[in-house]
Amino acid sequence: LLSLSGYIEDSGLDDLKNFFEEKIFPTKNLIDQGDYKLNQLSNIGVLEIKSLLSAKMIYAHEAGIDVTIDIPDRVDGFSIDTVDLARVLGIFLDNAIEAALETEQPQMGLNILQNQAGVSIIISNRFLDNGAGLHKLKQKGFSTKTGHQGIGLSNAQKIIRSYDHVLLETTIQCGCFIQHMELAARKE
């Protein structure tokens, strides 16, 4: 978006059109060809979240990760602030991508399920188990990655704790790291 705004502010419409055709349109063509399993993202009715998920899943696929996306029903809203949700999802997806790339068979999945109780978001990825317990991974300052500050998951936890109707369950099963977030529907 920043690059688009730069073209709009500094350049003419022709430059913006060229940028779109060279950088953005090829991605659309790849999606249309079915190389990516992104068609289910059309079920996300919140543009900011759909854009974030698209960008992360395209990046993961291009990095060589086997990506699975399952969003069977339309989701027109989430019961938390869009910016907060984008921050949490960005952290979870970045971590999932990095961890999956460390494995011999990188895989990750995104499931978003709408039901009467609210929305479930499940992000899973294969990872190399280095023996760090789940409680350590969530501590501020702890990172399994060299040169990282270890604040991502702790920041995500802080955001999630600020909502009394959002629950996060983190589990490890069969070589997969799973983040399962439940966003309960708000009572009106």
Tell me what each language-model feature is.
Residues 18-25, 39-63:
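Short beta-to-alpha transition helix within the HATPase_c
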Residues 103-117:
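Short beta-strand/loop element within the Bergerat-fold HATPase_c
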Residues 3-9, 82-106, 159-162:
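Conserved ATP-binding N-box helix of the HATPase_c
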Residues 150, 172-180:
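Glycine-rich nucleotide-binding loop
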Residues 155-167:
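Conserved glycine-/histidine-rich ATP-lid loop and adjacent helix of the Bergerat-fold HATPase_c
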Residues 41-45, 67-88:
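Conserved short strand/loop->alpha-helix "switch" segment adjacent to the catalytic nucleotide/phosphoryl-transfer site
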Residues 1-28:
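A conserved cytosolic signaling coiled-coil/coupling helix that links sensory/transmembrane modules
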Residues 119-150:
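Glycine-rich/acidic phosphate-handling loop/turn and adjacent ATP-lid/helix
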